[in-house]
Amino acid sequence: MNLNTKYHGSIEYEEKDVIYFQKGIPGFEELKKFIIFPVEDNEVFLVFHSIENKDIGIIVTSPFNIEKDYEIQLEEEQITNLKIQDEKDALVLNTVTLDSDIDKITVNLRAPIIINIKEKIGEQIIINSDKYKVKHPLFKEEA
């Protein structure tokens, strides 16, 4: 199949690449089907893109690129909804807010996207803790 995206051109994907979000994601609850593909010439960022709306693509990254000790505790309901039986089956991604000023690029560590890579289902959750910020700087100033 082919997805003609607004910013990333034409992307080839297969049905097995589609990840289903029963609740959609906050702000885009009506969109349920997404694919993930790499940003060209970049090993850190991925594109989390709706296949139902060619204009909706979100830059994401692994939280472990930002915080080596990043950890979250899923609630039983979330584990059940995502059918996670082993933590190796869970992919964790976080949304990135881009800015032309590199020092203003942030990552939302408070609301990770959790994907069961075996079952191809996902959910964006909100962590009820002040441990992580919604606007965590991607690049920290060196002391």
Curated annotation (Swiss-Prot):
Residue ranges the record marks as coiled coil: none
A cellular component annotation (GO) from this entry: cytoplasm
Swiss-Prot/TrEMBL keywords: Bacterial flagellum biogenesis, Chaperone, Cytoplasm, Translation regulation
Matches recorded under SUPFAM superfamilies: BH3618-like
Pfam families: FliW
Family membership noted in the UniProt record: Belongs to the FliW family.
PANTHER family tied to this protein: FLAGELLAR ASSEMBLY FACTOR FLIW
The protein's name in its UniProt record: Flagellar assembly factor FliW
